[in-house]
Swiss-Prot record:
The gene is dsbD. This is Thiol:disulfide interchange protein DsbD. Disulfide bonds join 122-128, 182-304, 480-483. It catalyses: [protein]-dithiol + NAD(+) = [protein]-disulfide + NADH + H(+); [protein]-dithiol + NADP(+) = [protein]-disulfide + NADPH + H(+). The keyword Cell inner membrane applies.
Amino acid sequence: MAQRIFTLILLLCSTSVFAGLFDAPGRSQFVPADQAFAFDFQQNQHDLNLTWQIKDGYYLYRKQIRITPEHAKIADVQLPQGVWHEDEFYGKSEIYRDRLTLPVTINQASAGATLTVTYQGCADAGFCYPPETKTVPLSEVVANNEASQPVSVPQQEQPTAQLPFSALWALLIGIGIAFTPCVLPMYPLISGIVLGGKQRLSTARALLLTFIYVQGMALTYTALGLVVAAAGLQFQAALQHPYVLIGLAIVFTLLAMSMFGLFTLQLPSSLQTRLTLMSNRQQGGSPGGVFIMGAIAGLICSPCTTAPLSAILLYIAQSGNMWLGGGTLYLYALGMGLPLMLITVFGNRLLPKSGPWMEQVKTAFGFVILALPVFLLERVIGDIWGLRLWSALGVAFFGWAFITSLQAKRGWMRVVQIILLAAALVSVRPLQDWAFGATHTAQTQTHLNFTQIKTVDELNQALVEAKGKPVMLDLYADWCVACKEFEKYTFSDPQVQKALADTVLLQANVTANDAQDMALLKHLNVLGLPTILFFDGQGQEHPQARVTGFMDAETFSAHLRDRQP
């Protein structure tokens, strides 16, 4: 008897295992958002803790966490650092796994005050949830004597709060600026002034005085960076507006034009004269006087340094990152000061001879500044036009460098010229595709022709108008990485398109996640994206054919053959 019971249990377990093995590949194995990201909160007077218990195999996006107080004032919310996650479409993003605890300080809360918390996450298997919004009721809190601050949740690290290059590049830019025609010839004179006209100083003493001079100059630049970044932080949201980004791009372009010699950009001569007189009153050779000289020198901008400095300051203001602002300007000043330190210690023999090459260095920095408007405009015009702008900039730079290199007489420059010409030819490809319509033609040939719907009523109407044909409904959103993978890799496949030739194709773009989108998702009982639904000729969905998560073209084609009604 016991043996029969054991055999029966084993048979039942085996049946469930095989059912799992041969289960429908499109059936959802994902849990609801509240289970994937279990949210909770706890308030103790001024202290509020928000917690997320994140299920294994799931993660939250740091940049998608938003906190909005209602009838309450809260201190700045500092999100902890996450771990880096990278995908093909969105690049690097910071995410949270396992557990997230976010402390929030309530400075003041009236009766009935609330906190709206918005967050969004995905599964590692390629399934993303719509943004979730939770309302946290707040207990009444009396304001203390400290000044309350408005909420300030960090927005996005990689594209908004960082330069399009490492801050260490500021050091190299500073060194490069030192070799422009307005700066390099002045170094021997500055060296003599710093040393106080004394010719018999020890090497250590000369190096110390020059270092102090550079630190004075760096202090001025660092202070400028901190002030500008702090000002930008107060207007962070406004500085991300498309019109502001376009305005900044125009300013950066004008700054680049000044580096090309179209006009001269510098401080008014009267102000420069006052600053120079203040510097001349300081005593060279003494640490205090040398430090003040350096600090004042940081304010005296020559035509060659004004445009790069203005470009860096404007971009720092746009980023709103104070650490980035101060550090970048400090490295920039240090880069400008390194050649001065070498000249002071080793003499003028280290200086290269002046010549037309210094103007070429200045022009090259004009192209560097032109990269900034392209970087900003990408956020407004999109990736395709952004790629075309990068292409135009690359062609212009490599073309200029190739023409400039033709003046060289050395034999090895022929190799450089070939490399520059090849780089220009590679850079022109996106413009070539645009001009001759290659990209547009490819997109027209490969993309499925979806009919867009928005509401439940529009879906029902489309099912009626299908007139007995099977219907496929694709739920899409810009924030869904796997949805973009479906577009690029699966829906573009000829076999998939052939299998869907007699199917009515509908698509609902729920990127906005507004009331209509949420109503549609709720009506269809959809947890997240990507989700693809199949309806028969009578307008009835076949739940077993539903697809959740990404499928490549081969798997999706097999699914269409086996499961499509």
